[in-house]
Regions:
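Exported/extracytosolic protein signature
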Residues: 1-127
Length: 127
């Protein structure tokens, strides 16, 4: 048996700012990197927000389709060896507390999805 290469895809999710005041926005950076020795195909990224987050916008190599608290990005056809793609998801803080965004990634070569969670603290300033 000859193995010509294996894709190894890394999913990272980080908030660009934390904590965030209620009413303000925070942008999450969703990075997918192919650390393997073969390309990966049909990369699907799905983000799910807590109810206290309101969708504002998204940007990246594929467009997001918003369905309630779920943002499904259109599939990325391929990710070459050593290649990295970044999606940006901006949300508005709607209530005070410690909240999460959950991101799932699946590809043709993965046997099961990869999941990452990022916590962000939303606060209010006393008046």
């Amino acid at each position: 048996t000859k193995i010509s290469g294996i894709p190894a895809v890394l999913l990272e999710v980080v908030d660009r700012e934390d904590p965030i005041e209620v009413g303000e926005t925070v942008t999450y950076e969703i990075a997918v990197t192919n650390q393997g020795s073969a390309e990966d195909t049909n990369i699907i990224v799905v983000a799910e927000m807590d109810p206290e987050m309101q969708y504002v916008s998204d940007a990246g190599p594929t467009k997001g389709n918003v369905n309630g608290r779920r943002i499904e990005f259109a599939p990325l056809p391929q990710l070459g060896v050593g290649e990295k793609k970044i999606w940006l998801l901006t949300v508005k803080a709607a209530a005070a507390g410690d909240f999460r965004i959950r991101v799932n990634m699946d590809t043709d070569q993965l046997t099961r999805p990869v999941m990452e969670t990022e916590a962000t603290n939303f606060y209010t300033t006393p008046k």
